[in-house]
Amino acid sequence: MSLTKKIKNEKSLKQEKQTDQLKSNLRNNNNNINNKSKPKDQNLNTLHYIKTHLKEELFFIFCVGGIYIFYLLYGLVQEQLNVTKFGTEKKVFGFTAFLLALQCFFNMVSAWLVSLVNKEQKDNTPFMKYGFVSMLLVISTFLSNQSIRYISYPTQVLAKSCKPIPVIFMGLLLFKKKYPFLKYIVVIVISLGISLFMLPKATSKKNIQFEGHDHLFGNFILFVSLMMDGVMGPFQDNLVRQYKPSATSMMLNTNIWNLGLFSIMAFARGEVSQAIDFILEYPEVIKLILAFCITSAIGQQFIFLTTNKFGSLNCSTITTTRKFFSILVSIFYFGHSLDNLQWAAICMVFGGLILDLYISYSNKKKGVVLSPIAAPVKHPTATTPLENKKSL
């Protein structure tokens, strides 16, 4: 009996060893298979990562190119409209309210088409809420465009780039806001740059297309335009925080108001009949008007696209650098004469704007949501387009 048991035990031990060996072999085979498949999986993940980021980078380049192309063209056309003299009588198309009403119509149609394509939800913002913001916007835009008749286009673009000044000034005066110390440094640098650029020596008649016009008056109405931007920004912030409208919806509703207000202004100033007579007498101006309106509408869509896809900080960086190139294009294309002091002033202003963007990026990394005050004011115009960010 003991011998039989011993034989059975040996057999069972042998079977257990064989079973363990089989299990071990299976485990090794599985490990080998997994090890072979891991590089393939990793390669697939890497390829997917590269393709995704390559698409994003190409799309970003596409957005940057769109903003640069259409807003640089817009700047050229805008200045061309204000300096071209038609006919033997050397008449200038000076019907600002009529022109801006047409621009708002094109912007409104553009926003409406985009909202249809995107099938956006209904905007819960009361329509009348857009009225006050639109009124400030109309005043700001009208004065900004009117100022080009008295000062050079580079001066206008440089001044309108300086949003930190009115935003901080109005924030302190009306809303008792507090800002980081570096923001005040930004304002000092930009203010000094603007002051140097606008010295009497720097604003001689050779820089002004309409001789005899008072550049001091042009600077004054430009200053009022900037103050309107400073007042308008916080009200827009509040509207966006409270009702959360989409960028396209805000563009559409604001431009409906703008169209109505600019139309009233154009009729009140007697511009409608005069502008139509001018167009009939000099039909070549139609090409400039259409280019002005179309580049504005398309450029705005690129602004919205960039903000929605890549954020307001990236969009602010693009628009800030774009304004710098707009000044350069205007200087070289139209032959504006600048001295060394003015070039230094331009560098100071854009240096301050870049510092403002750097502060905003640094705060974002620290988890502090602080939009660049150098960013374009969020309203749908061609000069300072809307940004679709609640943090703005």
UniProtKB/Swiss-Prot annotation:
Organism: Dictyostelium discoideum
Span list, region Disordered: 1-40
GO molecular function terms attached to this record: UDP-galactose transmembrane transporter activity; UDP-glucose transmembrane transporter activity
Biased composition (Low complexity): 25-35
Basic and acidic residues bias locations: 7-20
Family: Belongs to the nucleotide-sugar transporter family. SLC35B subfamily.
This protein's name: Solute carrier family 35 member B1
Keyword Cytoplasm: no
Membrane topology: Multi-pass membrane protein
Record text about domains: The di-lysine motif confers endoplasmic reticulum localization for type I membrane proteins.
Transmembrane segments: 57-77, 97-117, 124-144, 155-175, 179-199, 215-235, 247-267, 285-305, 341-361
Keywords in alphabetical order: Endoplasmic reticulum, Membrane, Sugar transport, Transmembrane, Transmembrane helix, Transport
Coiled-coil spans in chain: none
GO CC field: endoplasmic reticulum membrane; Golgi membrane
Motif Di-lysine motif, residue range(s) on this chain: 389-392
Function of the protein: Probable sugar transporter.
GO biological process: UDP-galactose transmembrane transport
Domain of life: Eukaryota
Keyword match Iron: no
Underlying gene: slc35b1
Pfam families: UAA
Predominant location category: endoplasmic reticulum
Protein location: Endoplasmic reticulum membrane
InterPro entries reported for this sequence: SCL35B1-4/HUT1
